[in-house]
Amino acid sequence: MALDSVKHLPIHGVSAFSSVTVEIKSFFSTVKPRKTSTFVYAFVVTFVALTVFLAFSPSPITVALAPSISSYVLPNITVSNSSNSSPSSLDSNFTTLRTPAPENLTAVTKNLTFESPVANGTTDTNAKTITIQFQTGHAKENISCPDNKTARDLDTHGARKAPLSEVLAVNSTASPKRKQRRKSSLRKVIESLKSCEFFEGDWVKDDSYPLYKPGSCNLIDEQFNCISNGRPDVDFQKLKWKPKQCSLPRLNGGKLLEMIRGRRLVFVGDSLNRNMWESLVCILKGSVKDESQVFEAHGRHQFRWEAEYSFVFKDYNCTVEFFASPFLVQEWEVTEKNGTKKETLRLDLVGKSSEQYKGADILVFNTGHWWTHEKTSKGEDYYQEGSTVHPKLDVDEAFRKALTTWGRWVDKNVNPKKSLVFFRGYSPSHFSGGQWNAGGACDDETEPIKNETYLTPYMLKMEILERVLRGMKTPVTYLNITRLTDYRKDAHPSIYRKQKLSAEESKSPLLYQDCSHWCLPGVPDSWNEIFYAELLVKLDQLGGKRRRKALKDHRS
């Protein structure tokens, strides 16, 4: 009966026992004495039964012995080896997936969309592959590690960057059960976000907000630090944006830092993007274990008027940067015939700082407010293309030309296989009774707009932006925060924009209000939560492409 239990186990469609029986019969044909024949026959049958049992046993101990035994008595077990490796290269766990030796690491293909060659399933034909086919009846494919190190794929310390398509992996230090729960929870969140329209919803009160304690972040620019400047009400900080179709995940600073480990996250635009950048830096800084490992890259404290600024998160070897470029194209000067200089705006040239950030891993652009100022609105002897200064040019046409220049630059200089590009929409102002330089005010606003009929009509400039984005080759994720932000007339600095007023400001403090920027903590934190949700979805999609490519390569 013991023999019956093993003789039906096929190896490549051949009965192991039948092939062994033939050899046993031929062996005994040379043995004459009956007693000796009976003894030897029993011994060999017992040996073969034991050998077959050991070969197919799942026990780690018996499995470790299987190759050496089966290589002698089970000739139908095949070992494929593309590099002429011997069965002795098998380890004690009888593994079928091998990592090639360092000398066999070969560059095969360039990384695709934040992916390493390992992640996207690229294989090295010289990699050592040991496949024991009798386990499943099918060959196993090797996963190789080509050494495709380029400066773009390495962090500032020379270490290989993990593919952004893999950064959603759950912390491997957790227990298996806890790790699986986290992974399952994250998967549910991401799936809910994929079918969600983030920009349609309501502002709801949540006492667990803000994301960081007011006054806890010493990096906030004075004009955004409303509570420190004396603002008495705090309810505006306890509102979060709630899409109708889903719930945005609370921004997990630690998770986001893992997502950008070894990378550059760069904001480019006007002071409203600086508003968003400072918000994110504060959220991330509050999530690290040792805040002394977060510092200014250039050692400057006053950075409001600097052209660029960068914070380093040393433990994560990443930077979160801001480049001031309010128009995204170059501010210029021309010399008149009488020798005087006149300011112009070059609609055909991107900002000078573009060379410094074109290789960033994640880019967040914006422009808008400076196009509403008097000089840009009039468009008289201001807009320039080449050596031509237009005597008169409509501001919306100038805006279209500038964004087209920016879009062409992105298509030419930003590699969509290496970088993610975002564009944040226009952030509405809420001046009442005049503009920012004409007595406009918002200091009595402590509640958001409740009736959407009071919202500002969608700007023509944002429609122009959408047309430009649709015409680009490079995928750009549009953070259309305009309408949801328009509700928040209650969250501007207003008169709480600075601690010490000048003598002139002290005479009429209500005449000097900021109803464009946002208090921090505040509305930009919600922009960043939407940005975080978009990142989760985008990176999951990249990971899906990587997995599909690996599967396709496997099948081919």
Swiss-Prot record:
Any single GO CC term annotated in Swiss-Prot or TrEMBL for this entry: membrane
Q: Which residues cross the membrane?
A: 38-58
Domain of life, per the record?
Eukaryota
Q: Where in the cell is it found?
A: Membrane
Any single GO molecular-function term of the entry would be: O-acetyltransferase activity
Picking any one GO biological process from the record gives: cellulose biosynthetic process
Principal cellular location given in the protein's record: membrane
Q: Where is this motif: GDS motif?
A: 269-271
InterPro entries reported in the protein's UniProt record: TBL, TBL_C, TBL_N
Tissue expression pattern: Not expressed in trichomes.
- Give the residue ranges of motif DCXHWCLPGXXDXWN motif: 514-528
Membrane topology field = Single-pass type II membrane protein
The record's keywords, sorted A to Z, are: Membrane, Signal-anchor, Transmembrane, Transmembrane helix
Q: What's the stated role of this polypeptide?
A: Can complement TBR and is therefore functionally equivalent, but may work in different tissue. May act as a bridging protein that binds pectin and other cell wall polysaccharides. Probably involved in maintaining esterification of pectins. May be involved in the specific O-acetylation of cell wall polymers.
- Miscellaneous comment text of the record: Contains 2 motifs that are conserved in esterases, but it is unlikely that this protein belongs to the catalytically active pectin esterases.
> Can you tell me which family this protein belongs to?
Belongs to the PC-esterase family. TBL subfamily.
- Please identify the protein, giving its name as recorded: Protein trichome birefringence-like 1
The species is: Arabidopsis thaliana (Mouse-ear cress)
Highest classification ranks of the organism: Eukaryota, Viridiplantae, Streptophyta, Embryophyta, Tracheophyta
